[in-house]
């Protein structure tokens, strides 16, 4: 990490300011050359003109110097706050490269922070998740994770496992020295407790992932019951074509919208019915796939039409699902001839007039999800918790069978999985993969 890296840290586009970030051994040297200054006071904002090597002015900017190790990366960092737009920051970046800086790779600033002990990979993932969060609630949950509770918990579990492994491997090396029965009991209890904690983390994260990622809602029903009208009403704008002709929607339509603090992704599906039309058949297949992927289902029926076999097929399709279903009787402002033979608790509404009741029911359901507790958004970390929990559980069984070598193997597996997200992990190839999806300049 002897080279000095540079990147634009703000999003591309027109704005009031743009920030160019510089990190490495020569960061201060380059900043002094650009500004014609002889020194910079750490952590002080300095207003200055910036010049290229032909002594032509680039911009007037604010420059802040963070002296190592008291910086984001643990190296010398200089941040330039220039005027915004597409050009100025690009010109400054080109000038830094001509002085000897290298363009940073995606996530390289965060990677250097991890390698220099300024943060754990878990903290870096939380920062990236916060940047990409799509709702106020998601940002709140991720910000809470950043305060260290999850990182401290994983580090404690990893430390417990390492200490236990040391005892067991010593016993393996000195076969004549059996582990005392009281110590075996303590180890067994430790395994049971830590396996349970990790299982709770990944099961909670899976069951409540909609709080962070957004809940997926699929609208389903036979053709021409008002599914597209309902989609438009929820979005508050005309997104889908509304027609009296059955089968108008042949593909799924997906859009995001917010209800309170919750992000929702709503999917309007093609009407489900028997059809000889090949394109419509494909649409129906996509509709059924959307139901599998959805967290919530809005099952729509037409109050102005007598219940028929196509309605029955919708009931049958949803009979064995464990997903939350809102049963909706649309067009309830018209003469109601639909017979509720299934005794469903229908929400009666008119999608073209008022869906307030549906919004209230949805809001109440979403608010019933407790946002407290440790929730993980990273699929990689969820899988690591699952693998570790299962390995520790297996290790406990092997301990009871006195299979210490296999016990040590399982414990090592759990330790290595958790270590990828804690302060002791330093393997460059895994960090490269982890930070490859980060923003440039982060």
UniProtKB/Swiss-Prot annotation:
Domain TrmE-type G intervals: 214-367
EC assignment: 3.6.-.-
Keywords tagged on the record: Cytoplasm, GTP-binding, Hydrolase, Magnesium, Metal-binding, Nucleotide-binding, Potassium, tRNA processing
Gene Ontology CC annotation, any one: cytosol
Names of the cofactor(s): K(+)
Amino-acid positions noted as binding Mg(2+) in the UniProt annotation, renumbered to this chain: 228, 249
A single MF term (Gene Ontology): GTP binding
UniProt: GTP binding residues: 224-229, 243-249, 268-271
Quaternary structure (record): Homodimer. Heterotetramer of two MnmE and two MnmG subunits.
Family: Belongs to the TRAFAC class TrmE-Era-EngA-EngB-Septin-like GTPase superfamily. TrmE GTPase family.
Summary of the function given for this chain in its UniProt record: Exhibits a very high intrinsic GTPase hydrolysis rate. Involved in the addition of a carboxymethylaminomethyl (cmnm) group at the wobble position (U34) of certain tRNAs, forming tRNA-cmnm(5)s(2)U34.
Name the UniProt record assigns to this protein: tRNA modification GTPase MnmE
Source species: Campylobacter jejuni subsp. jejuni serotype O:2 (strain ATCC 700819 / NCTC 11168)
Gene label: mnmE
